[in-house]
Every structure is written in C-alpha cells, then in structure tokens.
C-alpha cells in the first residue's frame, strides 16, 4: 500500500479524540450524507406486473440488448459494494464521509436486489437467469470491465485520489449509457416498473458520483495529475464503447430510440461534465445528443411517494413462488 502518500491524506488520518458524529466537524460532507439519506427506498416498492407483458411483446433483438445491460448491472453493483466494504469503509477516518459511504453501501445492496428482482420477474427460464447472474463468466466484456474496476480500486497500486477518480468513473461513465438506454423505454410508454427502478437508481448513482468528485476537489491532498485523470476517464469510455458494440451486436443493431453512435457521443459529453466537476480540462468537446432528456440527466427525477407505489400483487409477477415468498415477508414474519 502507498503508505508514504496515503498518510498525508486528511481523509485517512485517525482522530483518536473523536468518538461520536456530533458535533459535526465537516458540515459539507454531512450535508451530502443527509441528501443521500433522504433518497432511501427499498427494492420491493416498484410494481413490475405490467412489465411482463411489455417484455414478452418486445422484439427479440431489443430484449437481447436489455439483457446485456441487466447482466452488467448485477455484476457492477456487487463490485461497487466490494470496494466500499473492503477499501473505503476500512480506510476512511472522517466520520461524516464514513457515514456517507455506509449509506451508499446500503443503497448499493438495494440496487443489487432490485436488479435481481428485474431478472427474476422478466426472465422465467432458470438457465437464462443463471447466464445473466454469471455475467463475468459468460460475457467477456463484462469480465474486462470488472477487472478494470478492481485494478483502479486496488489500494496497493493507486493513491486515494486515483481510486476516487476511478470510483467516479465507475458510478458515472460505466453506468450512464445503460441508464439512458432504459430511460428511452419511457418514451415508448412501456416497462414502467423497469423505468421506475432506473430513475431511482440513476438518481442515487448521480449523488454517489458527485460526492466522489466533491472529495477529489475539496479533500484530496494528492490530487492526480490531469493526464492521469484523463487516462482513467478515457479508459472507462473505451470500455463503454466496447460494451455498446457488444450489446448492439447481440441486438443485431436494432434498438428503437437511439443508435450506438448517439450513445458514443453521449458518454463523451457526460465525461466532459465529469472533467468539469474534477476541475480538469474537457477531453471530447461534444454536445448532448439527447437534449430532450436533460431533466433525467441532471438527476432531477421527482421524489415519489413510495407507499403509493408499494405493490400488492407481486406474487402474480414473480413466477418463482419461493423467491416471491422471501421477497414479500413483512415485519410480522420476523
């Protein structure tokens, strides 16, 4: 581990005199935590009953495209959780930041559960489910992306600043195009449950990504050189390009609402915004190819009354009775 550098970082310095969160010593970080706390939701609070008919009516090439996205998501969130639990939450000593990452880890667990529910609901065939749940083994590009994430999260090879840049790239660049692709289903007025999940998860991930950028700009002493930041971000973009090509090949190039060239441009537009948040020069200097979805891109999805969304007929949507029973236990069952 890079001790000679890491020991200079305020985030990693133990305060032996501080045992409680109050009095707050880092109010901006505390505000980030409270913002994240306000977004709390659970995976059971989205109804996917209508999605089953929409999914079955969807052309097979389009279904194949979205299956690749689900395969990525079920793997990616687990790797994010792994990094939080084994690295950041063990290393970070500033309590307000640690509170944020504790809340983020809980949210990522909700996201992971939500993706599993989506797979179980939409894909009844158990062998096909397993192919999606085993994304790293079955999809070479997903394995490559997972290896890249673990490479940049490794504390023995990278400074804290480099790892935070990599973390922002994961939460932002690697996820963003997939969020956009799912959101286009809303314009087709189909898959309302999947779209609702997507809006809640993308909103959460937007906060996670922005917080990483905030720490880089305000707390990291050893900020990576701009060329290193650009290297990390460009590597992430190249991986996304490769995934998009792979997913479009599976869909035989037919996905309603957008082309892969539009997704290529969008991820570069998004990456330039990340550069701005990290106080770096932009890399690609391209416009937004999806101006009609600006509100979604800015994570301005209105907070929903989740009690109104709480489903009452989920057992009819999930074809695995044992799985459904486990999902819908209430407090009286414990």
Swiss-Prot record:
Q: How are cofactors bound according to the entry's free-text note?
A: Binds 2 iron ions per subunit.
List UniProt keywords, sorted A-Z: Deoxyribonucleotide synthesis, DNA replication, Early protein, Iron, Metal-binding, Oxidoreductase, Viral DNA replication
**SUPFAM superfamilies (alphabetical):** Ferritin-like
| The protein's required cofactors | Fe cation
Residue numbers binding Fe cation 1: 77, 108, 111
Question: Gene3D superfamilies recorded for this chain?
Answer: Ribonucleotide Reductase, subunit A
**GO MF term set:** metal ion binding; ribonucleoside-diphosphate reductase activity, thioredoxin disulfide as acceptor
Tell me, using the record's free text, what induces this protein.
Answer: Expressed in the early phase of the viral replicative cycle.
One GO process term, biological-process aspect: DNA replication
Q: Where is the active site?
A: 115
Catalysed reaction per UniProt? Answer: a 2'-deoxyribonucleoside 5'-diphosphate + [thioredoxin]-disulfide + H2O = a ribonucleoside 5'-diphosphate + [thioredoxin]-dithiol
Q: Does the keyword Lipid biosynthesis apply?
A: no
* Enzyme Commission (EC) number: 1.17.4.1
Q: Which cysteine residues pair off into disulfide bonds?
A: none
The answer to keyword Metal-binding applying to this record is yes
Q: Which family does it belong to?
A: Belongs to the ribonucleoside diphosphate reductase small chain family.
Note the subunit structure.
Heterotetramer composed of a homodimer of the large subunit (R1) and a homodimer of the small subunit (R2). Larger multisubunit protein complex are also active, composed of (R1)n(R2)n.
Report the function annotation for this chain: Ribonucleoside-diphosphate reductase holoenzyme provides the precursors necessary for viral DNA synthesis. Allows virus growth in non-dividing cells. Catalyzes the biosynthesis of deoxyribonucleotides from the corresponding ribonucleotides.
- For this entry, the protein name equals Ribonucleoside-diphosphate reductase small chain
Q: Whose protein is this, by species?
A: African swine fever virus (strain Badajoz 1971 Vero-adapted)
């Amino acid at each position: 581990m890079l001790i000679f550098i890491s020991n200079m970082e305020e985030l990693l310095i133990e305060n032996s005199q501080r045992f409680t969160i109050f009095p707050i010593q880092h109010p901006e970080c505390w505000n980030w935590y409270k913002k994240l706390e306000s977004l709390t939701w659970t995976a059971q609070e989205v109804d996917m009953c209508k999605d089953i008919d929409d999914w079955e009516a969807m052309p097979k090439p389009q279904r194949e495209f979205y299956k690749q996205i689900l395969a990525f998501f079920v793997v990616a969130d687990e790797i994010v959780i792994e990094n939080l639990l084994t690295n950041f939450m063990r290393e970070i000593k500033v309590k307000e930041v640690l509170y944020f990452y504790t809340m983020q880890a809980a949210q990522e667990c909700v996201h992971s559960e939500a993706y599993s529910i989506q797979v179980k609901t939409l894909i009844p065939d158990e062998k096909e489910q397993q192919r999606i749940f085993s994304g790293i083994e079955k999809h070479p590009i997903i394995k490559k992306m997972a290896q890249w994430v673990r490479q940049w999260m490794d504390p023995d090879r990278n400074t804290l600043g480099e790892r935070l840049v990599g973390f922002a790239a994961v939460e932002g660049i690697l996820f963003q195009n997939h969020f956009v692709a799912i959101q286009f289903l809303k314009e087709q007025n189909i898959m309302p449950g999947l779209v609702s999940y997507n809006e809640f998860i993308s909103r959460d991930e937007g906060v996670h990504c922005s917080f990483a950028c905030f720490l880089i700009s305000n707390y990291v002493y050893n900020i990576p050189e701009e060329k290193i930041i650009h290297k990390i971000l460009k590597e992430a973009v190249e991986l996304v390009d490769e995934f998009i090509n792979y997913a479009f090949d599976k869909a035989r190039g037919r996905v309603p609402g957008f082309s892969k060239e539009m997704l290529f441009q969008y991820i570069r537009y998004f990456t330039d915004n990340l550069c701005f948040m990290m106080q770096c020069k932009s890399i690609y200097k391209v416009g937004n190819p999806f101006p009609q979805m600006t509100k979604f891109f800015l994570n301005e999805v209105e907070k929903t009354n989740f009690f109104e969304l709480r489903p009452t007929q989920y057992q009819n949507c999930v074809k695995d009775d044992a799985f459904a029973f486990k999902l819908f236990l209430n407090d009286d069952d414990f």
